């Protein structure tokens, strides 16, 4: 009897996608940009698969498309691919610029984190001074200038009546809002194409202006 146990760990779901769609999801080495709207294709292809849920698939797909390995592949001349690895058109410059900005931001954060965790070198002992008639004045080291605070972006909760097609918005996904464009509004369901190429369906309460 086939096991119906659901996969809940994101790494396990990614491993399942690598195995099931090896021409689309690349486990090692250089990846390929994914087709816009691939999540819908993935959900339909796995609709009868009891191992994964749409929620977990969305989390795994977001982890895959926000990795450094994936963001580096979003570059000029690269072709998007579908679940079977078939070409689906070249990348738009807007998506390339957004991916490179996300990559730089992520790398800068990682660099700052490594610097904060690095052990500080031990202070060297100053050599003994030769006695002089007058006491030598020691200059106090200048205090470092305070770091400028990061700009605070004040988002506004969107109302359904405020939203229109082709409007740029921010979608609440995790800790950081993700930018995208509204592609369709169906009653209370708003379809948003994120700048990473992923298309999702959310309610107005998840959209920020």
Curated annotation (Swiss-Prot):
Any single GO molecular-function term of the entry would be:
RNA strand annealing activity
Query: GO cellular component annotations, sorted alphabetically?
Result: cytosol
Annotated compartments = Cytoplasm
UniProt key word Iron: no
Give the start-end ranges of region Disordered. 105-148
A Pfam family that this protein carries is ProQ_C
Share an example GO biological-process annotation for this protein: post-transcriptional regulation of gene expression
Keywords on this record? Chaperone, Cytoplasm, RNA-binding
> Tell me, what does this protein do in biology?
RNA chaperone with significant RNA binding, RNA strand exchange and RNA duplexing activities.
Assigned protein family:
Belongs to the ProQ family.
Name-wise, this protein is: RNA chaperone ProQ
**What is the originating organism of this protein?**
Shewanella baltica (strain OS223)
Q: Which gene is transcribed and translated to give this protein?
A: proQ
